């Protein structure tokens, strides 16, 4: 299964979207899933223990985000998580040893070399 999570509604950066779609390669079909609680693009996304985590990115008007949320495909719902300590966009996420790590990104003024679990 492949998830398409959020994104930019237009090239101006004024419109972030919260929609989530699931692609099933065996059936060659797309299914609409529950949207994120926060519309975002340029965010990090990673799977861990059957759940999907989305963090940071940019919201409407290019606002940098520190919000995080988790998607449970069993309930088809998103739940907010604790905010990150730094607003960041263009970050990478990695799942290692049962933890999600936020790596690098941009805070609006400078590139970040932070790694946070």
Sequence positions of predicted segments:
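Kelch-like beta-propeller repeat domains
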Residues: 1-117
């Amino acid at each position: 299964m492949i998830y398409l999570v959020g994104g930019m509604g237009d090239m101006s950066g004024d419109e972030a979207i919260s929609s989530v779609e699931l692609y099933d390669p065996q059936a060659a079909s797309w299914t609409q899933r529950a949207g994120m609680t926060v519309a975002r693009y340029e965010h990090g996304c990673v799977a861990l223990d059957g759940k999907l985590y989305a963090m940071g990115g940019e919201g409407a008007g290019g606002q940098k985000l520190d919000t995080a949320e988790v998607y449970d495909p069993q309930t088809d719902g998103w739940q907010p998580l604790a905010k990150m300590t730094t607003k960041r966009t263009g970050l990478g996420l990695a799942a290692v040893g049962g933890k999600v790590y936020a790596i690098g990104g941009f805070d609006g003024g400078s590139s970040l070399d932070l790694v946070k679990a």
